[in-house]
Amino acid sequence: MQTFLYPRTWLILGLLLLGSGCAVTPKTITQVPNTARPAAPSQAVYNSGGIYSPATYRPLLEDKRARLVGDTIVINITENTSATKSGSNSASKSGAVNAGITGLFGHNVPKASFNAASDNAYDDAAASNSRNVFTGTISATVTEVLPNGHLVVSGEKQVAFDRGTEFVRFSGVVDPMYVAAGNSVPSSRVADARIEYRTNSNLDTAQVMSILTRFFLSFAPL
């Protein structure tokens, strides 16, 4: 006795496989790696007896601020962007034709005339508004110190819930001059900033439904 699976069963199995493959860490647009460990201090070949070391230099008369690879810095995310776009088109066209007949094949005929007129108008208008607000705080790690002293920072925050995990990622280049008291800097002062908020929950999966799933649903919806 042979057992056959109905097309609906195959469809359910395929969707289950697709759903299991969607529960993965979403891709990122930020610079990786998202963290770095400080380098081990090099062994001094010659000891002059002084207490100053350029490799571990920390100012004594200012707050602790990020300077070296592995240091952390607080990023205050305060992004508020808006865009407005509008456009309009219009066109019009009109025409008229007048014709008259006084004779036909050499014979006089009663006066006849023909009149025709046309008038076309077209108007089109469109408008689009977009606004995005992203606020929050994330601690990032210095992953590289550029020759000019600027800091390449990158960080990730993960918050797990019952049905998914939220990912907040940030990367960019920080000028130490803009680092305020408390070792923090606003995101508006970060160059090449890349900020993202992603989830691997069902909500994010529904928004990025795979092409294969759409193919199945197109001819055999549940």
Swiss-Prot record:
Look up the signal peptide feature and give its range: 1-21
Record's keyword terms, sorted: Bacterial flagellum, Cell outer membrane, Lipoprotein, Membrane, Palmitate, Signal
Any one GO CC term of this protein is:
cell outer membrane
Q: Where is the lipid attached (S-diacylglycerol cysteine)?
A: 22
One Pfam family per UniProt = FlgH
Q: Which family does it belong to?
A: Belongs to the FlgH family.
What job does the chain carry out? Assembles around the rod to form the L-ring and probably protects the motor/basal body from shearing forces during rotation.
Name of the protein in question: Flagellar L-ring protein
Source species of the chain: Methylobacillus flagellatus (strain ATCC 51484 / DSM 6875 / VKM B-1610 / KT)
Task: Tell me what gene encodes this.
Answer: flgH
